[in-house]
Amino acid sequence: MSGIRADGTGDVGLIIAVKRLSAAKTRLAPVFSAAARESVVLAMLMDTLTAAARVGDLRSITVITPDESAAAAATELGAEVLADPTRQGDPDPLNNAILTAEQVVSGSVPNIVVLQGDLPAMQTQELADAICAARAHQRSFVADRLGTGTAALCAFGSALDPQFGPDSSAQHRRSGAVELTGAWPGLRCDVDTPADLAAARSLGVGPATARVVAHHR
């Protein structure tokens, strides 16, 4: 058994794709230095992984990343780590990384959920409830709080067919994925901008994010 779940009793594999930290969250530049942004991104990943690890439906959690620091943090928390083989300059790096991870993870579980790694306010029960709702559909997704992006993509007995990128919510809908409508405010609150971070903090972020943000503000 791979990943964070110690007992491996679930039937879902979770995938989180993380880009190189030095290139992540540039829209947080108005409030954080480059070095601070890397720390914030890493902390958000740690809080996301920690919350996800308590979901009973998960058999494994896999992080695919080219970043050594992100890989080390994920490994320390018990996640399986895949080195992202996506070449620099690839026109669709995120979806290709997810497809690479899907090929590996689908060999051991019938169902896969892709989750954003920047959900510091996500509660374990929110993800558990979303996975429960997703079981009614072959492909489904959870839109972000603004309704334009995608916080999670779920595939039950089906290929993921990820459509992440600009307006990914609409892209996933057009591809046939069913939009899940639960409230799940923390699950929907991915952090790309200072406004997103403020929204996440108003919900309550995990301890790693709280410490790093307090240190750098």
Swiss-Prot record:
Keywords: GTP-binding, Nucleotide-binding, Nucleotidyltransferase, Transferase. GO terms for biological process: F420-0 metabolic process. Gene3D superfamilies: Spore Coat Polysaccharide Biosynthesis Protein SpsA, Chain A. Its EC number is 2.7.7.105. It catalyses: phosphoenolpyruvate + GTP + H(+) = enolpyruvoyl-2-diphospho-5'-guanosine + diphosphate. Guanylyltransferase that catalyzes the activation of phosphoenolpyruvate (PEP) as enolpyruvoyl-2-diphospho-5'-guanosine, via the condensation of PEP with GTP. It is involved in the biosynthesis of coenzyme F420, a hydride carrier cofactor. PANTHER family: 2-PHOSPHO-L-LACTATE GUANYLYLTRANSFERASE. Belongs to the CofC family. This is Phosphoenolpyruvate guanylyltransferase.
